[in-house]
Amino acid sequence: TKNEIRKNLILKRNQLSKETVQKNSNYIMEKLHPYVREAENIMIFMNMGNEVEITRLITLYPDKKFYIPKTLSDRNMKINLYDENELILHKFGYYESSSDIFYDEKILDLIIVPAVAFDYTKNRIGFGGGYYDTFLSRILLNDQNNGKNRNKPMIIGVCYDFQLIDYIPSEVH
């Protein structure tokens, strides 16, 4: 089940050494470079624990605008412009913005998505709240409704190699 996969992979990720996290994060930064270089408005996540250290992108690309998610009620998620001075610790252990100034997700060129697991058909397992699934569904629906008038943001999921698995049981959100 998804819950078993989630539990096992979080346990495995939590056992990684800091050196392994840094080495793997460096490798992932290199792989992201061509996409980040071309983008202006980039949504990242605020990594926590042993997740890929994606917030390094902020210092690597000071000329880019980075946006971070803020979780609201009803599986809703909006984006704030990243500002180090506005960060507050969320009850689940990650940082989010204290600001109530939200930006339209249509400005995003690149969305970097975390996961506990991905499979080869783009299914993902997150922490179980459904926030990213709802957010990404809305973006993809907006793209369909707007026809070809605008470019779709590129969506890239990041994880360690052991988090890429053959099959994730999919659910409709």
Where are these regions (language model features)?
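Redox-cofactor binding/interface segments in oxidoreductases and associated redox assembly factors
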Residues: 44, 113-114
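Long, contiguous hydrophobic alpha-helical segments, chiefly transmembrane helices and signal peptides
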Residues: 94, 115-116
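Short glycine-rich, flexible loops that bind phosphorylated cofactors or substrates
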Residues: 51, 119-120
